[in-house]
Design a protein with these regions (language model features):
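N-linked glycosylation sequons
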Residues: 1-382
Protein backbone atom coordinates (compact mmCIF):
# COMPACT_ATOMS: atom_id res chain seq x y z
CA UNK A 1 0.00 0.00 0.00
CA UNK A 2 1.15 3.51 -0.77
CA UNK A 3 0.13 6.02 1.89
CA UNK A 4 0.52 9.74 1.20
CA UNK A 5 0.37 12.73 3.49
CA UNK A 6 1.50 13.23 7.04
CA UNK A 7 0.46 11.18 10.02
CA UNK A 8 -0.19 14.44 11.87
CA UNK A 9 -2.77 15.69 9.37
CA UNK A 10 -6.33 15.89 10.62
CA UNK A 11 -9.74 16.52 9.18
CA UNK A 12 -13.39 16.58 10.21
CA UNK A 13 -16.40 16.13 8.02
CA UNK A 14 -20.16 16.08 8.42
CA UNK A 15 -22.69 14.12 6.43
CA UNK A 16 -26.36 13.18 6.43
CA UNK A 17 -27.04 9.58 7.33
CA UNK A 18 -30.79 9.73 6.75
CA UNK A 19 -32.43 12.61 4.87
CA UNK A 20 -35.96 12.02 3.55
CA UNK A 21 -36.66 13.57 0.15
CA UNK A 22 -40.16 14.69 1.13
CA UNK A 23 -41.71 16.37 4.16
CA UNK A 24 -45.05 17.90 5.14
CA UNK A 25 -45.10 21.70 5.23
CA UNK A 26 -45.25 23.03 8.77
CA UNK A 27 -44.53 19.62 10.29
CA UNK A 28 -41.28 18.39 11.89
CA UNK A 29 -39.13 16.13 9.73
CA UNK A 30 -36.79 13.64 11.41
CA UNK A 31 -33.28 13.37 9.97
CA UNK A 32 -29.99 11.79 11.05
CA UNK A 33 -26.43 13.06 10.59
CA UNK A 34 -22.91 12.22 11.76
CA UNK A 35 -19.71 14.18 12.41
CA UNK A 36 -16.57 12.17 11.61
CA UNK A 37 -13.00 13.04 12.63
CA UNK A 38 -9.66 11.48 11.76
CA UNK A 39 -8.78 11.86 15.43
CA UNK A 40 -11.59 9.55 16.46
CA UNK A 41 -14.10 10.52 19.09
CA UNK A 42 -13.53 13.87 20.72
CA UNK A 43 -15.26 16.75 22.41
CA UNK A 44 -18.83 17.63 21.38
CA UNK A 45 -19.12 19.75 18.25
CA UNK A 46 -21.52 22.62 17.60
CA UNK A 47 -23.52 22.06 14.41
CA UNK A 48 -25.28 25.00 12.76
CA UNK A 49 -28.60 24.06 11.16
CA UNK A 50 -29.98 26.29 8.40
CA UNK A 51 -33.16 25.95 6.35
CA UNK A 52 -33.36 27.90 3.10
CA UNK A 53 -30.42 30.05 4.13
CA UNK A 54 -31.73 30.98 7.59
CA UNK A 55 -30.12 29.50 10.69
CA UNK A 56 -32.77 27.79 12.80
CA UNK A 57 -30.75 26.11 15.56
CA UNK A 58 -27.36 25.04 16.87
CA UNK A 59 -27.09 21.36 17.78
CA UNK A 60 -24.47 19.63 19.93
CA UNK A 61 -23.09 16.52 18.24
CA UNK A 62 -20.91 13.72 19.58
CA UNK A 63 -18.14 12.93 17.11
CA UNK A 64 -18.55 9.54 15.47
CA UNK A 65 -22.10 8.97 16.71
CA UNK A 66 -25.31 9.18 14.63
CA UNK A 67 -27.25 12.22 15.79
CA UNK A 68 -30.97 12.84 15.46
CA UNK A 69 -32.26 16.11 14.06
CA UNK A 70 -35.78 17.49 13.70
CA UNK A 71 -36.45 20.42 11.35
CA UNK A 72 -39.71 22.05 10.32
CA UNK A 73 -40.26 22.34 6.57
CA UNK A 74 -41.46 25.92 5.95
CA UNK A 75 -42.44 25.93 2.28
CA UNK A 76 -44.02 23.83 -0.40
CA UNK A 77 -41.59 22.92 -3.16
CA UNK A 78 -37.85 22.63 -2.74
CA UNK A 79 -36.26 23.35 0.64
CA UNK A 80 -32.54 23.29 1.42
CA UNK A 81 -31.41 21.95 4.80
CA UNK A 82 -27.75 22.71 5.50
CA UNK A 83 -25.49 21.56 8.34
CA UNK A 84 -22.21 23.29 9.10
CA UNK A 85 -19.34 22.97 11.58
CA UNK A 86 -16.44 25.35 12.22
CA UNK A 87 -13.01 24.67 10.80
CA UNK A 88 -10.45 23.49 13.34
CA UNK A 89 -6.89 24.84 13.30
CA UNK A 90 -4.74 22.56 11.19
CA UNK A 91 -7.61 20.94 9.30
CA UNK A 92 -6.81 19.86 5.75
CA UNK A 93 -9.93 21.47 4.30
CA UNK A 94 -13.26 22.90 5.33
CA UNK A 95 -14.98 21.92 2.08
CA UNK A 96 -16.46 18.89 3.83
CA UNK A 97 -17.54 20.86 6.90
CA UNK A 98 -20.92 21.38 5.27
CA UNK A 99 -23.66 18.97 4.26
CA UNK A 100 -26.78 19.75 2.27
CA UNK A 101 -30.06 17.88 1.85
CA UNK A 102 -32.84 18.82 -0.57
CA UNK A 103 -36.34 18.26 0.79
CA UNK A 104 -39.51 18.75 -1.25
CA UNK A 105 -42.22 20.25 0.94
CA UNK A 106 -45.70 18.82 0.41
CA UNK A 107 -48.79 20.55 1.74
CA UNK A 108 -51.49 18.65 3.51
CA UNK A 109 -54.97 19.69 2.50
CA UNK A 110 -55.30 23.45 2.82
CA UNK A 111 -57.95 24.59 5.28
CA UNK A 112 -59.93 27.60 4.08
CA UNK A 113 -62.67 29.44 6.01
CA UNK A 114 -65.11 31.27 3.73
CA UNK A 115 -67.58 33.62 5.43
CA UNK A 116 -70.20 35.08 3.08
CA UNK A 117 -72.51 37.98 3.84
CA UNK A 118 -76.01 38.27 2.48
CA UNK A 119 -76.57 36.18 -0.66
CA UNK A 120 -75.60 37.88 -3.92
CA UNK A 121 -75.09 36.95 -7.57
CA UNK A 122 -71.44 35.99 -7.14
CA UNK A 123 -71.70 34.21 -3.80
CA UNK A 124 -71.02 30.75 -5.21
CA UNK A 125 -68.03 31.78 -7.33
CA UNK A 126 -65.51 31.46 -4.52
CA UNK A 127 -67.27 28.43 -3.07
CA UNK A 128 -67.35 26.55 -6.39
CA UNK A 129 -63.69 27.31 -7.08
CA UNK A 130 -62.52 26.14 -3.66
CA UNK A 131 -64.77 23.08 -3.65
CA UNK A 132 -63.36 22.01 -7.02
CA UNK A 133 -59.80 21.97 -5.64
CA UNK A 134 -59.07 18.53 -4.18
CA UNK A 135 -56.27 19.98 -2.04
CA UNK A 136 -58.63 22.34 -0.17
CA UNK A 137 -60.75 21.54 2.88
CA UNK A 138 -63.43 24.25 2.82
CA UNK A 139 -65.47 25.48 5.77
CA UNK A 140 -68.19 27.81 4.44
CA UNK A 141 -70.77 29.85 6.33
CA UNK A 142 -73.29 32.27 4.88
CA UNK A 143 -74.77 34.75 7.35
CA UNK A 144 -78.44 34.51 6.39
CA UNK A 145 -80.00 35.69 9.62
CA UNK A 146 -78.10 37.95 12.05
CA UNK A 147 -79.03 37.66 15.77
CA UNK A 148 -80.50 41.16 15.85
CA UNK A 149 -83.14 40.27 13.25
CA UNK A 150 -86.54 39.98 14.93
CA UNK A 151 -89.49 39.12 12.69
CA UNK A 152 -91.61 36.95 14.96
CA UNK A 153 -90.56 33.63 13.46
CA UNK A 154 -90.80 30.92 16.18
CA UNK A 155 -87.44 29.41 17.10
CA UNK A 156 -88.71 25.88 16.44
CA UNK A 157 -89.48 26.85 12.84
CA UNK A 158 -85.96 28.05 12.05
CA UNK A 159 -83.81 25.52 10.18
CA UNK A 160 -80.60 27.54 10.37
CA UNK A 161 -77.59 26.50 12.43
CA UNK A 162 -75.82 28.81 14.83
CA UNK A 163 -72.56 30.34 13.63
CA UNK A 164 -69.79 28.73 15.79
CA UNK A 165 -67.86 31.96 16.28
CA UNK A 166 -65.78 30.97 19.30
CA UNK A 167 -64.78 27.63 17.82
CA UNK A 168 -63.71 29.18 14.50
CA UNK A 169 -62.15 32.48 15.55
CA UNK A 170 -60.64 31.57 18.93
CA UNK A 171 -60.09 27.85 19.33
CA UNK A 172 -59.31 26.84 15.74
CA UNK A 173 -58.29 30.03 13.95
CA UNK A 174 -54.66 28.89 13.76
CA UNK A 175 -55.75 25.77 11.88
CA UNK A 176 -56.84 27.78 8.84
CA UNK A 177 -54.44 28.57 6.01
CA UNK A 178 -56.74 31.26 4.60
CA UNK A 179 -59.77 33.24 5.78
CA UNK A 180 -62.02 34.86 3.15
CA UNK A 181 -64.68 37.47 3.90
CA UNK A 182 -66.94 37.58 0.84
CA UNK A 183 -69.12 40.71 0.93
CA UNK A 184 -69.26 40.46 4.70
CA UNK A 185 -70.25 43.41 6.88
CA UNK A 186 -70.04 43.69 10.64
CA UNK A 187 -72.99 42.08 12.36
CA UNK A 188 -73.56 41.04 15.95
CA UNK A 189 -72.78 37.51 14.76
CA UNK A 190 -69.09 38.23 15.33
CA UNK A 191 -68.17 39.93 18.64
CA UNK A 192 -66.02 43.01 18.12
CA UNK A 193 -63.14 41.43 20.06
CA UNK A 194 -62.85 38.64 17.52
CA UNK A 195 -61.68 41.07 14.84
CA UNK A 196 -58.62 41.61 17.03
CA UNK A 197 -58.01 37.87 16.93
CA UNK A 198 -58.17 37.90 13.14
CA UNK A 199 -55.68 40.79 12.94
CA UNK A 200 -53.37 38.91 15.28
CA UNK A 201 -53.78 35.77 13.17
CA UNK A 202 -52.56 37.72 10.12
CA UNK A 203 -49.64 39.31 11.99
CA UNK A 204 -48.46 35.87 13.04
CA UNK A 205 -48.45 34.46 9.53
CA UNK A 206 -52.08 33.91 8.52
CA UNK A 207 -53.73 34.83 5.22
CA UNK A 208 -56.80 37.04 4.79
CA UNK A 209 -58.77 37.97 1.67
CA UNK A 210 -61.47 40.63 1.51
CA UNK A 211 -63.79 40.23 -1.49
CA UNK A 212 -65.53 43.59 -1.16
CA UNK A 213 -68.88 44.86 -2.36
CA UNK A 214 -70.98 47.94 -1.52
CA UNK A 215 -71.09 46.87 2.14
CA UNK A 216 -67.37 47.76 2.46
CA UNK A 217 -68.28 51.40 1.84
CA UNK A 218 -71.21 51.38 4.27
CA UNK A 219 -71.62 52.24 7.94
CA UNK A 220 -71.30 48.58 8.96
CA UNK A 221 -68.06 48.08 7.04
CA UNK A 222 -65.51 45.73 8.59
CA UNK A 223 -63.07 48.61 8.08
CA UNK A 224 -64.80 50.21 11.08
CA UNK A 225 -63.75 47.33 13.35
CA UNK A 226 -60.36 46.45 14.88
CA UNK A 227 -59.74 44.43 11.71
CA UNK A 228 -58.70 47.72 10.08
CA UNK A 229 -55.20 47.16 11.48
CA UNK A 230 -54.78 44.32 8.97
CA UNK A 231 -56.45 45.95 5.97
CA UNK A 232 -54.42 47.51 3.12
CA UNK A 233 -56.91 50.30 2.33
CA UNK A 234 -59.75 52.21 3.98
CA UNK A 235 -63.04 52.90 2.14
CA UNK A 236 -63.91 56.39 0.96
CA UNK A 237 -67.62 55.63 1.06
CA UNK A 238 -67.87 55.71 -2.74
CA UNK A 239 -69.40 52.94 -4.82
CA UNK A 240 -68.68 53.60 -8.49
CA UNK A 241 -71.26 51.88 -10.70
CA UNK A 242 -69.56 52.27 -14.06
CA UNK A 243 -68.59 49.83 -16.81
CA UNK A 244 -64.85 49.15 -17.13
CA UNK A 245 -62.37 46.55 -18.24
CA UNK A 246 -60.26 45.28 -15.32
CA UNK A 247 -56.67 46.07 -16.31
CA UNK A 248 -53.24 45.20 -14.99
CA UNK A 249 -51.16 48.03 -13.60
CA UNK A 250 -47.50 48.37 -14.59
CA UNK A 251 -46.69 46.55 -11.37
CA UNK A 252 -49.33 43.92 -12.12
CA UNK A 253 -47.70 43.12 -15.45
CA UNK A 254 -44.64 41.93 -13.52
CA UNK A 255 -46.28 40.47 -10.41
CA UNK A 256 -46.55 36.64 -10.50
CA UNK A 257 -50.21 36.74 -9.40
CA UNK A 258 -51.32 38.69 -12.47
CA UNK A 259 -48.41 38.43 -14.93
CA UNK A 260 -49.42 36.70 -18.14
CA UNK A 261 -53.08 36.48 -17.08
CA UNK A 262 -55.01 34.96 -19.98
CA UNK A 263 -56.40 37.80 -22.09
CA UNK A 264 -54.28 40.58 -20.57
CA UNK A 265 -51.96 41.06 -23.56
CA UNK A 266 -54.51 42.83 -25.78
CA UNK A 267 -56.09 46.27 -25.46
CA UNK A 268 -58.80 46.27 -24.38
CA UNK A 269 -58.13 43.03 -22.50
CA UNK A 270 -59.72 39.93 -23.95
CA UNK A 271 -62.24 39.48 -21.15
CA UNK A 272 -65.59 40.94 -20.15
CA UNK A 273 -66.31 44.23 -18.44
CA UNK A 274 -67.23 44.68 -14.80
CA UNK A 275 -69.65 47.32 -13.57
CA UNK A 276 -68.73 48.23 -9.99
CA UNK A 277 -65.65 49.48 -8.13
CA UNK A 278 -65.43 50.21 -4.40
CA UNK A 279 -63.52 53.42 -3.66
CA UNK A 280 -60.58 53.33 -1.22
CA UNK A 281 -57.94 55.79 -0.05
CA UNK A 282 -54.26 55.50 0.85
CA UNK A 283 -53.78 51.95 -0.46
CA UNK A 284 -50.81 50.08 0.98
CA UNK A 285 -48.89 47.19 -0.53
CA UNK A 286 -49.04 46.48 -4.25
CA UNK A 287 -51.85 47.61 -6.56
CA UNK A 288 -51.73 44.99 -9.32
CA UNK A 289 -55.10 45.62 -11.03
CA UNK A 290 -57.10 48.79 -11.61
CA UNK A 291 -60.80 49.39 -12.14
CA UNK A 292 -63.03 52.28 -13.19
CA UNK A 293 -61.18 55.62 -13.54
CA UNK A 294 -57.92 53.78 -12.75
CA UNK A 295 -59.03 53.16 -9.16
CA UNK A 296 -57.35 50.30 -7.26
CA UNK A 297 -59.06 46.99 -7.96
CA UNK A 298 -56.76 44.31 -6.53
CA UNK A 299 -54.40 44.98 -3.62
CA UNK A 300 -51.81 42.57 -2.24
CA UNK A 301 -50.05 43.42 1.01
CA UNK A 302 -47.90 41.96 3.76
CA UNK A 303 -48.80 42.51 7.41
CA UNK A 304 -46.23 41.23 9.88
CA UNK A 305 -45.57 37.63 8.93
CA UNK A 306 -48.91 37.26 7.13
CA UNK A 307 -50.52 38.44 3.91
CA UNK A 308 -53.71 40.26 2.97
CA UNK A 309 -55.51 40.60 -0.35
CA UNK A 310 -58.37 42.93 -1.23
CA UNK A 311 -60.55 42.63 -4.34
CA UNK A 312 -62.51 45.87 -4.63
CA UNK A 313 -65.39 44.66 -6.77
CA UNK A 314 -68.06 41.99 -6.45
CA UNK A 315 -68.33 41.52 -10.21
CA UNK A 316 -65.97 38.58 -10.73
CA UNK A 317 -68.99 36.32 -11.18
CA UNK A 318 -69.49 37.91 -14.63
CA UNK A 319 -66.33 36.15 -15.78
CA UNK A 320 -67.51 32.89 -14.22
CA UNK A 321 -70.91 33.12 -15.96
CA UNK A 322 -69.40 33.80 -19.39
CA UNK A 323 -70.78 37.33 -19.74
CA UNK A 324 -69.31 38.91 -22.91
CA UNK A 325 -67.12 35.85 -23.24
CA UNK A 326 -66.19 35.68 -19.56
CA UNK A 327 -62.66 35.90 -18.22
CA UNK A 328 -59.89 34.03 -16.38
CA UNK A 329 -61.57 34.02 -12.96
CA UNK A 330 -60.29 30.56 -12.02
CA UNK A 331 -56.70 31.48 -12.90
CA UNK A 332 -56.87 34.81 -11.08
CA UNK A 333 -58.69 33.64 -7.95
CA UNK A 334 -56.46 30.59 -7.57
CA UNK A 335 -53.30 32.65 -7.90
CA UNK A 336 -54.57 35.16 -5.33
CA UNK A 337 -55.36 32.41 -2.84
CA UNK A 338 -52.05 30.61 -3.32
CA UNK A 339 -50.00 33.83 -3.10
CA UNK A 340 -51.72 34.62 0.18
CA UNK A 341 -50.78 31.13 1.41
CA UNK A 342 -47.13 31.74 0.39
CA UNK A 343 -46.84 29.38 -2.56
CA UNK A 344 -43.12 29.57 -3.55
CA UNK A 345 -43.91 29.63 -7.27
CA UNK A 346 -45.73 32.95 -6.78
CA UNK A 347 -43.07 34.78 -4.76
CA UNK A 348 -42.14 38.16 -6.24
CA UNK A 349 -38.43 37.54 -5.69
CA UNK A 350 -37.30 33.98 -6.32
CA UNK A 351 -34.02 32.36 -7.31
CA UNK A 352 -33.78 28.71 -8.32
CA UNK A 353 -31.03 26.55 -9.77
CA UNK A 354 -31.27 23.16 -11.45
CA UNK A 355 -28.47 20.90 -12.60
CA UNK A 356 -28.63 19.19 -15.99
CA UNK A 357 -25.54 17.05 -16.47
CA UNK A 358 -22.59 19.45 -16.39
CA UNK A 359 -24.86 22.48 -16.87
CA UNK A 360 -26.36 24.66 -14.14
CA UNK A 361 -29.58 26.46 -15.07
CA UNK A 362 -30.33 29.54 -12.95
CA UNK A 363 -33.73 31.21 -12.95
CA UNK A 364 -34.56 34.47 -11.26
CA UNK A 365 -38.06 35.85 -10.79
CA UNK A 366 -38.01 39.52 -9.91
CA UNK A 367 -40.14 42.66 -9.86
CA UNK A 368 -37.23 44.92 -10.84
CA UNK A 369 -36.28 45.66 -14.45
CA UNK A 370 -32.58 44.79 -14.15
CA UNK A 371 -32.03 41.98 -11.64
CA UNK A 372 -28.27 42.01 -12.22
CA UNK A 373 -25.84 39.09 -12.47
CA UNK A 374 -26.07 35.93 -10.38
CA UNK A 375 -23.20 34.95 -8.11
CA UNK A 376 -22.32 31.25 -8.11
CA UNK A 377 -20.17 29.83 -5.32
CA UNK A 378 -18.67 26.40 -5.94
CA UNK A 379 -18.07 23.83 -3.17
CA UNK A 380 -14.45 25.03 -3.04
CA UNK A 381 -15.69 28.44 -1.92
CA UNK A 382 -14.70 30.22 -5.13
Amino acid sequence: ALITGSEHEKDRRIRFENAPRFGLVGKPLDMTYRVISTEGNGAPVDVRVSVNGEQVSVEHATVGQPMKLSVTIPNAGRNIVQLGIDREPGELTDANNRAIALVDGIRENLRVLLVSGEPHAGERTWRNLLKSDASVDLVHFTILRPPEKQDGTPINELSLIAFPTRELFVEKIKDFDLIIFDRYQHRDVLPILYYDYISEYVEKGGALLIAAGPEYAGENSIARTPLNAALPAMPTGEVVDKAFYPRLTDLGQRHPVTRGLDGSASEPPHWSRWFRTIGVKNPEGEVVMKGADDRPLLLLDRKGEGRVGMLLSDQGWLWARGFEGGGPHVQLYRRIAHWLMKEPELEEERLTADGHGMMLEIRRQSMIDDPGPAQVITPSGK
